[in-house]
Amino acid sequence: MKASKKMFLIDLVTLMPEMFEAFTNFGVVGRGFKKNFVDINFINPRNFATDTHKTIDDRAYGGGPGMVMMAEPLIESVESARIREKSLGIKKRKVIHLTPKGPKLKHEKVKELSCEEGLILIASRYEGVDER
C-alpha cells in the first residue's frame, strides 16, 4: 500500500496504545481519521523487550528518583517505524520524544510539523531514557 500524499502518517511509540485509540474515533480528530487524512500505527515497546516479564524500564544509573526507559526496546520500536516508512515509500520522518521535561509543544511548532509527511512520536511517562 502506497501512502497517499494527503495522508499524515504517525507511528506512536507508547506503553498504552489503548489510551490513544479512543481519541481516534471522536470529534475533529476522529473525523480526520475517518476521512483518511491521518494514519496512526501504535507501537508498544514491550513487544521488543527480551525478558519474560517484558521489562522496559530500570532505575537510573547512579541512583536518583524515578525510573528510566531502557534504550533497547525504544530503539527497536523506532526501527520498526523506519521499516514501515520504507514499505510505504516515504522519506525518513522526524522522531519526537514527548516528555514532561521537554519544551512545551506550541501551536507554531505544530503548524511547522504539519508540513511533514508524518512523524514518529514517542509518548514517554518516564524520567528519561537510559543513557548507558
Describe every region a protein language model picked out.
Residues 70-125, 129-130:
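S-adenosyl-L-methionine/SAH cofactor-binding core of RNA-modifying enzymes
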Residues 23-27, 108, 132:
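Generic recognition of short, well-ordered alpha-helical segments
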Residues 46, 129-132:
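Acidic-glycine-rich active-site phosphate/pyrophosphate-binding loop
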Residues 2-81, 85:
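N-terminal nucleotide/polyanion-binding subdomain common to many enzyme families
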